[in-house]
């Protein structure tokens, strides 16, 4: 049902982004602690400075500490994680439109939609056939058999359906191929 290779690639990218984000935040926060230690040494007179210079160094250090700590915590807490790629289920018309637009990603398709495609399309596109139960398909038959199967598959995979019309059915978004790009 779900391609494990595709999942591993997405997971690796996600881990890289999280590691990068955490490293930047850790460097900023640890630098602020080092500056705080420097400030303590200046204020305790371990590092001897004139009274006037000690005040300037203390104020500049406090501002730098505050900025670095705030930036580190902000990056750590609020930087959004990258979005996972959208899964796409398409009927035969949607697959043909995606092929015209040279879509290179994986497209989930039902057996009925696959039967309606010309033979060359199956070889050119990255298609994966998804089986759906007849009970699920029966709920959406008023939209046509092919689209009903695609809607049931999209509901199963938590995906969007690409077709020749645009609507929303039972929480599943049906879009046109041009809306995807």
Swiss-Prot record:
It comes from Archaeoglobus fulgidus (strain ATCC 49558 / DSM 4304 / JCM 9628 / NBRC 100126 / VC-16). Its main location: membrane. It is a multi-pass membrane protein. One of its GO terms (cellular component) is plasma membrane. This is Uncharacterized protein AF_2025. It comes from the Archaea. It is found in: Cell membrane. The chain crosses the membrane at residues 24-46, 55-77. Keywords: Cell membrane, Membrane, Transmembrane, Transmembrane helix.
């Amino acid at each position: 049902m779900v391609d494990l290779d595709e999942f591993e690639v997405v997971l690796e990218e996600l881990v890289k982004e999280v590691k990068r984000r955490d490293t930047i935040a850790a460097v900023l926060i640890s630098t602020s602690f080092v500056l705080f230690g420097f400030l303590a040494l200046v204020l305790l007179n371990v590092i001897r400075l004139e009274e006037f210079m000690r005040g300037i160094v203390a104020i500049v250090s406090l501002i730098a500490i505050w900025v670095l700590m705030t930036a580190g915590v902000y990056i750590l807490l609020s930087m959004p994680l990258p979005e996972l790629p959208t899964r796409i289920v398409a009927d035969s018309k949607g697959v043909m439109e995606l092929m015209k637009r040279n879509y290179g990603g994986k497209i989930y398709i039902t057996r009925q939609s696959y039967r309606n495609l010309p033979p060359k399309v199956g070889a050119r596109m990255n298609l994966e056939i998804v089986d759906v139960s007849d009970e699920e398909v029966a709920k959406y038959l008023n939209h046509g058999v092919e689209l009903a199967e695609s809607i049931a598959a999209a509901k199963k995979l938590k995906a969007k359906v690409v077709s020749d019309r645009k609507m929303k059915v039972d929480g599943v978004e049906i879009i046109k191929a041009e809306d995807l790009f």
